Amino acid sequence: MKNPKDLYLVHLSIHGLIRGENLELGRDADTGGQCKYVVELVKALAKHESVGQVDLFTRRVIDPKVSSDYAQPIEALGNGAFIRRITAGPKRYLRKESLWRHLDAFLDHSLALFRENNRIPDVIHAHYADAGYVGSRLASLLGCPFIFTGHSLGRTKLESFLEKEVNREKVERRYNLPARIEAEELALDSAALVCTSTHQEVEQQYSVYELYAPDRMRVIPPGVDISRFAPPQEKPIPDSVASNIERFLDDTNRPVVLAIARADEKKNLGALVRAFGESEFLRDKANLVLVAGNRNRIADLNPGARKVWTELLQLIDDYDLYGCVSIPKKHEPDDIPAFYRYAASKKGVFVNPALNEPFGLTVIEAAASGLPVLATNDGGPRDILGNCQNGNLIDPRDVPALTRTLGNALSDAEQWESWSSRGLDGVRKHYTWEGHVKRYLEEASGLLEAITQPHLITEKLRTTLPLADRIVFSGLEDDLLESDEAAIAELRELCNANQPNLGFGIATGRSLQMARALIEKHGLPEPDLYITQLGAAIHYGKRLVPDLSWEKHLNHRWEPDAIMEILDLVEGIELQEGPGRQHQFKISYNYQKGVAPRRREIQKLLREHQLPAKVVLSQGSLLDVVPLRSGKGQAIRYVAMRWGIPADKVLFYARRGSDYEALSGQFLAVLGSDHSLELKSTTSLPRVFLASKPNFAGLVEGINAYQFGGGIKVPASAQGLDPDHADEKEAVLAPDMEVHVSDGD
């Protein structure tokens, strides 16, 4: 491990509302236990002697509907820990399903921040699928180890919906599940370690993924801040908390059945009310306390929370639970520990009836408060109760069994005392942040010791093209080369007039030799660099100097011989022959549609053999297999980072589906009037100028529209939809994140 106070760790948690104190847990479906876990982990890591700085990157939100805290670019957490809020998409708050189209902007702004601070992290740790998408690319570009924690996985979510016989297409579109699952697959493949909280996550959730690798899984249970949670005999219960609960109750001396969860269907609070209401014993001898977030008017809640509260109120009325159920409207974050203590003081129990609970932080908090637990048998509570022995697991779908278990738990005083003391001891033994950080840093140390290559982009590296401060990229498609001579001459004149500030680059799927020949044949400007073979190679200048760092970068887990051995057995595809057809980092096949498997099936086949790669189908007849780390967009980001050129000074001429990757971030883009149908959905994106002309005439039109040779200004027609008023439901689905079907170039 590095010297004390040396490690620089970066955590990514993009969605939800995140701040250092007074987290608004339960405000919506995106601001839950994950947010609290990440903030507390970052704070705990910063206290360790081996750590110099920890940054938590999240999305910046400027929205009158939420606190101004979320608009602050930086928030100090103490001991060298910071929250850094990154601009991505519109200013307003967005639910996580609407963030996918803005993740490349988050990536570009994060890269700019690392460049500005002139420091590269030792480890990047991403939380949840959206951060996994960004983090895997950041770590790839920066050359540092990547850790992933999924928290809640898309395949599990999809399965739970399908069990309810919900329309698959509708669910996938609403929750953007194809993009989420693909991001999780790629994060699993890119991660040096996958950090989970429980063995159940590994065995039942991660194991169903194509790129699941058991040897990279690490179960490290998170901790709980024991200074906040304590039994009632050690900390008093504020009068305000007691009165907030008791104002609903007729008899405040009864034992309490407590549930604390956000108002979300997955939390299954309705089942708990049914279990309570079905029992005469519980109705007569106990009180039910439901803490399900804050609310003013139920009508003003988001649709999901409104549906849950409507159901709860109907059930309370159906079972006539008035006087024995408490439903506080508001509470402060600091009230949560007191809710547990209140229930413990009444010899009650805490119930987590969730249909699935990835970890179960509330279960640990209850145990740390001396409150016995009844918790779902689906998820993390299995491990927690196994370690602490302070309660029983329940089947969240079996209401009669839950009724019986509740009655038994509240009727056995000796068992209650045993569970209470075991919970207190178990938490201190298994769930402290000190223990979590110690194990976490031991694993991180192993990753750092395994690094044999320097960072791809080192802190001291500045530039390989000294004078260019902006760059234009174009492809070399056949129809693009049909441009009239006047358009090509104008492009050549424009590039020459703006030297040395303006660089010109080619980004193509063609070989370097063919690209050179076409440029000479058609009289195109002399490129300053070439990105060829779908991003598999980068060369600089007239001498065509190869970028050896990029080659080492692409070589990570690239096994072309093993790939060809597997694909030799696949019917309907055949290796292309001839000069320039094959490349060190691109395997090219002829593809026979109707005979060969679909591209997605070929991708799955390689994954099943633990061969990470991208499978690209072009023109319906050409199939390429390239390293997972390659791609036009990723190569352009690497070049821009290496040269020190900001993303908003990179202009990309897009015409084919394979160009999508370069349109969704902070690059400036020009869309030729003859663009393919795959790019139709991008015309509403910001920084995408729709040219009225085709071919190179469209590129020249775009360069002039952006005033790219001078002060650079995004024209009004390239502002996209008004991001602060556009309906977030109209956000396009993110494309397949590992391949972009194109017409080829």
Give residue ranges: language-model regions:
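Catalytic cores of nucleotide-sugar-dependent glycosyltransferases that transfer UDP/GDP/TDP-activated
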Residues: 1-364, 368-452
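Conserved acidic, metal-coordinating active-site core of Asp-based
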Residues: 563-665
